Amino acid sequence: MGSIAKEEQPSTKVEKPTFSSKANTLEFAQSLDAKDHMRRFRDQYIIPSKANIKTKKLAKPGLSDEPSIYFCGNSLGLQPKCVQEYLQAHLDTWSSIAVHGHFRDLEDSPLTQWQLLAEHAAKQCAPIVGAKASEVAIMGTLTTNLHLLMASFYTPTPEKSKIIMEWKAFPSDHYAIESQIRGHGYNPEEAMVMIAPDEGSYEISTEKILRTIDEHASTTALLLLPGIQYYTGQLFDIKTITAYAQSKGLTVGWDLAHAAGNVPLQLHDWNVDFAVWCTYKYMNAGPGSIAGAYVHERHGEVDYSEGEEKPKYRHRLMGWYGGDQSCRFLMNNKFRPSPGASGYQVSNPSVVDLTSLCAALSIFNQTSMAEISQKTLHLTAYLEHLLLSTNSSDSPAFRIITPSDPSARGTQLSVLLKPGRLETLSDMLEEAGIVADKRKPDVIRVAPVPLYNTYEDVWNFVQIFNKALEKCEEA
């Protein structure tokens, strides 16, 4: 089935960086940037200018050269400059050779033939999620893929029908789980087991998750959690939770929307059954771009022991694009799935989407998740240090609800404001040329992305953020 696209294994113990008394100066931030080996990547992205992020017309390059501070990659990543080149190559292919683009490689194009483009993107994506290329399929959108994989992996019985999930999951995940349960004839109020945060905390501890598994294992069919919780930014211990749940007889799936491209993953080595993710956040493939799916190789096997006409394989919702390429165009209505995750594909994927994704992933091919995570470690720790150094312990203006432990988070810090401050503060930040993400109730999610953000960005953000807080206090 091929080899695992390995990244360096992350250490289980991550030491948080410490900073000197001079850390709260512009000169210190600039000195960190000067030593940053990843600063070479910033120029490969288009950073919106402060003027352009406020305009109500198509962006004009001449409006301003002063870049905005863009800390919203956890919602939508910035556009890589190479995307335009790749898209133009696709348009030129379509206009010049039309249908022949499906099967013909062009010598001067950065793209492979359309029929192989999804497979190529899967190979690019595999190292990012720690999987074999055959275990990755690039297809659909995140919630669509979640439905497709739950159709295969959620197999409830009257004795075991529950799904263990997080309390206040991202709404689309909640809807998908609820509808799958209803579709099988069960009551969501009884079958949805929601794990709430620990008392007095916004975090859900691994211990509480394991206790919940113990409590409900005999009646549970599936454990489905996010790799990183979208509101708090908490990174779950995927390896430990997966192994424990499987030891109790549960199938385990993960929504990696906020984890893929953000933190090191080893889905194959961790024995995860299935996972889904989007590519428009940390992978920077564009709004609504095509998504990814992972299926462990043991679930993608096709057994021909009873002959070529009687393949045995795991049940899934079938479509022609999941058929083996050797017989996909025979049109004989005899489904022979492609081995691996590609056998779970349904429809012909959008080449425009694949083109944008392949362009974005070409930058990841120049680095590694190990290198990315090292900068994330330092960049987010610096942001945390500056924020906390000016937040009064007697009467704090905000609270960081993301875990302080760097092994339990990625790039995002979720800043919980006092009630009623969110809209006013967000407007002030936007007016100052800062793009961050607000999430009701009362949270600003700040995500400095290591591929294109700098330590100077972090320093400038904190100065503006503190001034905006002071104005809110005075109002």
Curated annotation (Swiss-Prot):
Homodimer. Its EC number is 3.7.1.3. One of its GO terms (biological process) is 'de novo' NAD biosynthetic process from L-tryptophan. It comes from Botryotinia fuckeliana (strain B05.10). It is an enzyme of class 3 (hydrolase). Its cofactor is pyridoxal 5'-phosphate. Catalyzes the cleavage of L-kynurenine (L-Kyn) and L-3-hydroxykynurenine (L-3OHKyn) into anthranilic acid (AA) and 3-hydroxyanthranilic acid (3-OHAA), respectively. Keywords: Cytoplasm, Hydrolase, Pyridine nucleotide biosynthesis, Pyridoxal phosphate. This is Kynureninase.
